[in-house]
């Protein structure tokens, strides 16, 4: 019996319908080969469609124009602008702030997370603590930065599985007095729940595992200026408690930015922690005006 041949399946790939955005060519000539932040603008002058950053603005923007998956954004774009920075660090910080402030249509949404939390050992057990209640820039003994309580407990559970820790002792599940937990029978718990190992041994492994997640306290008395330089451009990044207050051209201008940060900035911490502690930048300590 002959089988009727089916019509070939049409696959609408982005590449098949992609057209090079010729209408954006006038904006390409002046693109700098320097670090900074760039903007794809649509019809609205108030809000860009997309904000990006790169150590080479020109190269990165041109790569967008050759990417079929970004055809929708490119079709809506009408012009391209940019802001140069003194280096990659400045580009990272400026991009993160502008995306939060302007919420471009084609960027992943970045918002201040009111559920940001961490793990802290209190009374011998790890507890979930929140940035809204605890100053994460100065509180000692914080481990991990998590989007919400569920993510924090999931990380603790993953650590328990790796270290054969007891869910019951950690407070992740209830225990019946005098009886081993279910995971002990499966050899997934080393037995702190039933005396097979001491609580001290259990807690030592817990602390060892949490050490890799330690949140670094702000190591300076107050605000600092981080000097970033390239060619003929120098910026001083004014930072306090892992919060980027902005950048200025000279230290004399820093006073205008000095203020107490409005809470812990997760994105600022992620961007700044390693570069600041690595010692690769000149750091100038600043005084912060006292609150009146």
Where are these predicted regions, by residue range?
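Acidic, glycine-enriched active-site microenvironments
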Residues: 1-292
């Amino acid at each position: 019996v002959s089988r009727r041949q089916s019509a070939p399946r049409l696959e609408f790939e982005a590449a098949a319908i992609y057209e090079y955005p010729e209408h954006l060519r006038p904006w390409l000539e002046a693109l700098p080969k320097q670090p900074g932040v760039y903007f794809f603008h649509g019809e609205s002058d108030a809000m860009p469609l997309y904000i990006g950053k790169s150590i080479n603005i020109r190269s990165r923007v041109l790569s967008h124009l050759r990417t079929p998956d970004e055809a929708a954004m490119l079709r809506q774009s009408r012009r391209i602008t940019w802001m140069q920075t003194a280096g990659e660090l400045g580009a990272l910080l400026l991009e993160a702030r502008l995306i939060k402030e302007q919420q471009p249509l084609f960027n992943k949404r970045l918002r201040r997370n009111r559920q940001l939390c961490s793990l802290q050992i209190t009374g011998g057990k790890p507890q979930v603590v929140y940035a809204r209640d605890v100053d994460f820039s100065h509180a000692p003994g914080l481990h991990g930065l998590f989007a919400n309580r569920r993510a924090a407990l999931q990380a603790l559970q993953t650590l328990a599985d790796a270290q054969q820790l007891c869910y019951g002792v950690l407070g992740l599940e209830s225990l019946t007095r005098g009886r081993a937990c279910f995971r002990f029978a499966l050899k997934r718990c080393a037995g702190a729940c039933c005396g097979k190992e001491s609580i001290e041994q259990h807690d030592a492994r817990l602390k060892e595992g949490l050490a890799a997640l330690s949140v670094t306290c702000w190591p300076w008395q107050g605000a600092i200026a981080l000097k970033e330089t390239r060619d003929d451009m120098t910026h001083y990044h004014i930072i306090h408690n892992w919060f980027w207050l902005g950048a200025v051209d000279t230290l004399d201008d820093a006073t205008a930015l000095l203020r107490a940060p409005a809470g812990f900035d997760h994105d600022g911490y992620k961007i700044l922690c390693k570069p600041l502690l690595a010692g690769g930048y000149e750091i100038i300590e600043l005084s912060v005006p006292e609150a009146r």
